[in-house]
């Protein structure tokens, strides 16, 4: 928080030491923006704690993961979150080829959850500040 003014855009981490979760798109994006190899950790919470302890200048991770960490850990007073989204990603379920029964059940359930507002309620509960 004390140096929040120095980090208003992603470009501010150019040349800085950035932490990220190992093997994630956050790691790739951190290295792309900073121009340096990211310090990696098994999970985003470990990366956030390294930031708090001064071991890096920034953390790049999935927005919902960061928001959840800040909410649940009660550590938000130590961090400044940029409003900028660095990437977007699509997610899906893998279903064994030819298993139309499971595929159709998943697709049907997802559509139902979106239509009845369940997805929006879950998102609001877990990810809206």
Residue ranges of model-derived segments:
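Proline/Glycine/Serine-rich low-complexity intrinsically disordered segments
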Residues: 1-129
């Amino acid at each position: 928080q004390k140096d929040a003014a120095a980090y208003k855009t992603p470009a501010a981490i150019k040349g800085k030491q950035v932490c990220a979760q190992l093997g994630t798109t956050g790691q790739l994006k951190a290295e792309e923006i900073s121009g340096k190899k990211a310090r990696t950790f098994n999970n985003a919470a470990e990366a956030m704690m390294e930031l708090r302890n001064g071991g890096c200048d920034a953390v790049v991770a999935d927005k919902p993961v960061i928001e959840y960490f800040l909410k649940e850990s009660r550590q938000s007073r130590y961090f400044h979150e940029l409003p900028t989204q660095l990437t977007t990603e699509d997610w899906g379920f893998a279903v064994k080829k030819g298993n139309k029964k499971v595929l159709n059940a998943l697709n049907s359930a997802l559509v139902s959850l979106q239509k009845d507002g369940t997805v929006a309620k879950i998102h609001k509960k877990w990810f809206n500040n």
